[in-house]
């Protein structure tokens, strides 16, 4: 497959040490050579070499650059690729790009370089999606999962499962078309059932990693809830190590939702500091309280903050009811003051959920809280070096659909349905798994996926 030659700025816009303009396509080297001036021509350069020179426009030097030449097929796109390393900035870099476009290159669409890598067989679709996961990774663990997926861990597993299904379908066809025994139908059903159970077990095992994988990829929507002035904003500031929320002794200071990402021992949290939940006549505060209730309902995880220096109130107990059904940690704050809280009642309300004591003004208890969060979600098993995690929502949905199709095969065999009918569900499972790797996928989906990438990627 051959495309036109595309160009784009691959580094973020703005001032910086360097900026990279990337070209890919059959004319990439020739187009770059038209504007690059040095001792030797780029057209004669060997692959994977770097060259110093200048970019000129109408005889005027507009940039001093280093140019990398990479010839097909040993490139990311499997096309000729040129990367121009210029000084970071806006004006000169855009002039270089415009010069390339005037000399025959077309401006790349978002994600077009990665899309070409997929279409040219350099990577499959799950590996292409992992590129974006790596870019967006917020923790070392999320980065590790993305790198393993880019390396083909998930692809190899899916392809092995598809091969198992294909082998079974081929055997079904042989047994139907060339029966040698009277009991061929029974033998075929038994073989098909064994293969189905094998593939189904693997799909179920993959889906068991989905919850942790999704956490790593997207982060946990974490609502910090509690009555006014119990220390919610102090907790947010301590976790992100930055003064984002106003902290005062005046109840009701936080009137809107504040969101921040933080990495807590490998667990990515999207922290949501909510307005204190209480009955109020203040119109503005009332809006904040309603938003807090919605944030609580939508949260994946809750940090329920109580003031250890005050007695438990009806409003506090109502928060436990609202948190029911969620994963949550109870934070008993202000341990530097006299304890007035009924701790036994708190333990009764919290049930199996962890309870951590803190004195945020004295920086005490934060490590214990971070450890409780890590243990609650990962319990250490996420660290397996070669583990394959499913984190992409699209992949998870396709695996669930494939599992449903495989269950249909099992049910059909158990009901005594003919194998040529049962194999329809088997073929559907094969197709669905193929959508994960891109072996069977619609062009519209490809456009939708790659448009999520930035320009130059």
UniProtKB/Swiss-Prot annotation:
Positions bound to K(+): 229, 248, 250, 253
Domain (TrmE-type G): residue spans on this chain: 219-378
Superkingdom of origin: Bacteria
Enzyme Commission number(s): 3.6.-.-
Keywords assigned: Cytoplasm, GTP-binding, Hydrolase, Magnesium, Metal-binding, Nucleotide-binding, Potassium, tRNA processing
Main location: cytoplasm
CDD domains: trmE, TrmE_N
Subcellular location: Cytoplasm
Pfam family of the protein (one): MMR_HSR1
Binding site for (6S)-5-formyl-5,6,7,8-tetrahydrofolate: 22, 83, 122, 457
Cofactor list: K(+)
One GO-annotated biological process of the protein: tRNA methylation
Record-level GO cellular component terms: cytosol
Comment on bound cofactor: Binds 1 potassium ion per subunit.
SUPFAM superfamilies, per the entry: P-loop containing nucleoside triphosphate hydrolases, TrmE connector domain
Residues at which GTP binds: 229-234, 248-254, 273-276
Function description: Exhibits a very high intrinsic GTPase hydrolysis rate. Involved in the addition of a carboxymethylaminomethyl (cmnm) group at the wobble position (U34) of certain tRNAs, forming tRNA-cmnm(5)s(2)U34.
Subunit description: Homodimer. Heterotetramer of two MnmE and two MnmG subunits.
PANTHER family: TRNA MODIFICATION GTPASE GTPBP3 (PTHR42714), TRNA MODIFICATION GTPASE GTPBP3, MITOCHONDRIAL (PTHR42714:SF2)
NCBIfam families: mnmE_trmE_thdF, PRK05291.1-3, small_GTP
Family: Belongs to the TRAFAC class TrmE-Era-EngA-EngB-Septin-like GTPase superfamily. TrmE GTPase family.
Record protein name field: tRNA modification GTPase MnmE
Gene: mnmE
């Amino acid at each position: 497959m051959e495309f036109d030659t595309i160009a784009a700025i691959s580094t973020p816009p703005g001032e910086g040490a360097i900026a990279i303009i990337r070209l890919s396509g059959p004319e990439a080297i020739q187009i770059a050579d038209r504007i690059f001036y040095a001792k030797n021509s780029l057209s004669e350069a060997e692959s994977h070499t770097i060259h110093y020179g200048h970019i000129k426009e109408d005889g005027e030097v507009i940039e001093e650059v280093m140019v990398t030449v990479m010839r097909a097929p040993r490139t990311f796109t499997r096309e000729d690729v040129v990367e121009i390393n210029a000084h970071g900035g806006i004006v000169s870099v855009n002039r270089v790009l415009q010069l390339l476009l005037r000399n025959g290159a077309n401006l790349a669409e978002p994600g077009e370089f990665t899309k070409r890598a997929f279409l040219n067989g350099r990577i499959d679709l799950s590996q292409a999606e992992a590129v974006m996961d790596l870019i967006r990774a917020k923790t070392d663990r999320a980065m590790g999962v993305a790198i393993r997926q880019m390396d083909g861990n998930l692809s190899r597993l899916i392809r092995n499962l598809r091969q198992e299904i294909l082998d079974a379908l081929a055997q079904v066809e042989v047994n139907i078309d060339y029966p040698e025994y009277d009991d061929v139908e029974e033998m075929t059903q038994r073989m098909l059932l064994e293969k189905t159970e094998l593939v189904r077990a693997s799909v179920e095992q993959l889906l068991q990693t989905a919850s942790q994988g999704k956490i790593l990829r997207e982060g946990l929507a974490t609502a910090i809830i509690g009555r006014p002035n119990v220390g919610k904003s102090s907790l947010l500031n301590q976790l992100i190590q930055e003064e984002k929320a106003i902290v005062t002794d005046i109840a009701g200071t936080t009137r809107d939702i504040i969101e921040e990402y933080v990495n807590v021992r490998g667990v990515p949290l999207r922290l949501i500091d909510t307005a204190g939940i209480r009955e109020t006549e203040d119109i503005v505060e009332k809006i904040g309280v309603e938003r807090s209730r919605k944030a609580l309902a939508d949260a994946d995880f809750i940090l329920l903050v109580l003031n250890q220096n005050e007695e438990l109130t009806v409003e506090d107990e109502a928060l436990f009811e609202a948190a029911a059904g969620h994963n949550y940690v109870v934070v008993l704050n202000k341990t530097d003051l006299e304890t007035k809280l009924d701790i036994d009642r708190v333990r009764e309300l919290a049930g199996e959920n962890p309870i951590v004591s803190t004195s945020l003004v004295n920086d005490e208890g934060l490590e214990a809280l971070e450890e409780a969060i890590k243990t609650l979600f990962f319990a250490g098993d996420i660290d397996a070096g070669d583990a394959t995690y499913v984190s992409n929502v699209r992949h998870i949905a396709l695996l669930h659909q494939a599992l449903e199709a495989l269950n249909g095969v099992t049910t059909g065999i158990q009901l005594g349905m003919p194998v040529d009918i049962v194999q329809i569900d088997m073929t559907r499972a094969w197709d669905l798994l193929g959508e994960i790797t891109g072996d069977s996928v619609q062009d519209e989906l490809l456009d939708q996926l790659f448009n999520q990438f930035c320009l130059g990627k």
